[in-house]
UniProtKB/Swiss-Prot annotation:
Belongs to the TrpF family. It comes from Azorhizobium caulinodans (strain ATCC 43989 / DSM 5975 / JCM 20966 / LMG 6465 / NBRC 14845 / NCIMB 13405 / ORS 571). The gene is trpF. This is N-(5'-phosphoribosyl)anthranilate isomerase. It comes from the Bacteria. GO terms for biological process: L-tryptophan biosynthetic process. It catalyses: N-(5-phospho-beta-D-ribosyl)anthranilate = 1-(2-carboxyphenylamino)-1-deoxy-D-ribulose 5-phosphate.
Length: 228
């Protein structure tokens, strides 16, 4: 199965088109005012329409209340809701039931102890996204360009599709894919020139790096040799 590529934090028509043209499988829109990648509700419909079925639309929210959730879902019309805050398993289940949308729960990781919550979230979320745990001085729950020890995920099988995030870019994504089995990779700061400013060139380079790594990892096909 092909590894899915998600470009997150898109906020302009130009960079959205760059992600779609590059072949991204999922495009992420952040609705969180504290983020430099924040997309306000009034800008959401145009971006959502521009996707036009070429990729899955992911709406990233951080600890949304019911009013924020309803307004954002109405504006973005997402295919998947990504929860990137401290939402409990019970809240994840409630959001999934309330919206009727698949939910991807982001889980922050810095050490083995952080994986103890995986079974509880795997029971209620449709997908799991493992991201680097923010440092104490980080103001955002994700998109900080931090990398964690990918080997922590080796052998992990939560019974749900798994995506990796946290400091990925075109230069290190192949290494990540060689360390742990993944269903997808998620990039934001790794395709930016500054916080919130996506680079079409970096987006293309990242997608190409994933595809190249995927192709290189496929078992070689042995040619049949006829006996003399």
């Amino acid at each position: 199965m092909a590894i899915e590529v998600k470009i997150c934090g898109l906020s302009t028509a130009e960079t959205l088109e760059a992600a779609l043209a590059a072949g991204a499988d999922l495009v992420g829109f952040v609705h969180f005012p504290k983020s430099p990648r924040h997309v306000p509700l009034e800008a959401a419909p145009a971006l959502s329409r521009a996707v036009a079925g070429r990729a899955a639309k992911v709406l990233l929210l951080v600890d949304p209340d019911d009013a924020t959730l309803a307004a954002a879902v109405a504006a973005f019309q997402p295919d998947i809701i990504q929860l990137h805050g401290k939402e409990s398993p019970e809240r994840v289940a409630a959001i999934r039931a309330r919206t009727g949308r698949p939910v991807m729960k982001a889980l922050p990781v810095s050490g083995p102890a952080d994986l103890a919550v995986v079974p509880a979230y795997a029971a209620v979320a449709d997908r799991l996204l493992f991201d680097a745990k923010p440092a104490p001085d980080d103001t955002l729950p994700g998109g900080n360009g931090r990398v964690f020890d990918w080997t922590l995920l080796a052998g992990l099988d939560p019974g749900r599709p798994v995506m990796l995030s946290g400091g990925l870019d075109a230069g290190n994504v192949s290494q990540a894919l060689s360390v742990v089995r993944l269903d997808g990779v998620d990039v934001s700061s790794g395709v930016e020139t500054a916080p919130g400013l996506k680079s079409p060139e970096k987006i293309l380079a990242f997608v190409r790096a994933v595809k190249a790594a995927e192709a290189a990892s496929r078992p070689s096909r042995l040619k049949k040799v006829e006996a003399p």
